[in-house]
Amino acid sequence: MELNDAIRTTFSARDYTGEDLSDETLYDILETARFAPSGGNRQGNRVIIVRDQSIKDRISDLNLPAAKRYVAQVNAGENPWNAVVPTKVADAEIAATEPAALLTEPFKMASVVLVFLVDLKVVASVDQ
């Protein structure tokens, strides 16, 4: 398959089979990703590989405030996480909103979670 075909026909998967991902496959993926563009090509990224279920559960919990905000903004007819138009949804309403499972459960269900970090002091932030 040509790259152009792959890009145009591959969907954005949000469901997981529960199938384990071998270290070899994971390292192959990360090695290939290493060649992707980065700010100024300075490679300021790091990846933490998480397989421990208790840590994946904690990552899911850390996502709860963002998931609640997303749902509250959608319910209010807003475009969630919009950087141009500030939200009119009150903090109390956001806190009382039930988060959507699709924004939190995937962290728990995946066989592995990759946490990507970038040192902004290293890369060139060309999108200022």
Identify the function of each model-found stretch.
Residues 9, 32-35, 61-65:
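Residues within well-ordered alpha-helical secondary structure of globular protein domains
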